[in-house]
Amino acid sequence: MDQRLKKALKHADYVTTFKNQKRALKEKFSKDTTVYYCGGQFTATREFISSVLSLRCDIFVDNNSTPIKIKDKEDFYNVLVEAFTKASEEYYTEYKKIVNSERTVQGILDV
C-alpha cells in the first residue's frame, strides 16, 4: 500500500476515534449536569442557573414539562451551580487529556 494512503487512513482513524471520545465526553457532561430536585429533573445550564434567583416566581418547569414548586430557591441554586461547576471542570480536564494525548488511535484510547 502506498505510504501516503497508509498515513491518510491512520489519520482518518485518529479523527474518528477523537470524535467518538469527544461525543462520549459531551454525553457524560450532559448526564452530569442533570439535577433531580423536588421530584423534578432539571438541566444545569448557565442560562437556567442565572434565572433561578433573578425570577420572583418559585415555580419552574422541569425537563419533562412538569411544573415544580421550589421552596428553597437558594438551595436549588447552589445544587445547580455545584453540578454545573463539577461537570464543567471534569469535562475540561478529560478533554485536555484527549487533546494532549499521543496523536494515534491507541494514544487516545489509553487516556
Feature annotation, model-predicted:
Residues 1-111:
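A preference for well-ordered globular domain cores
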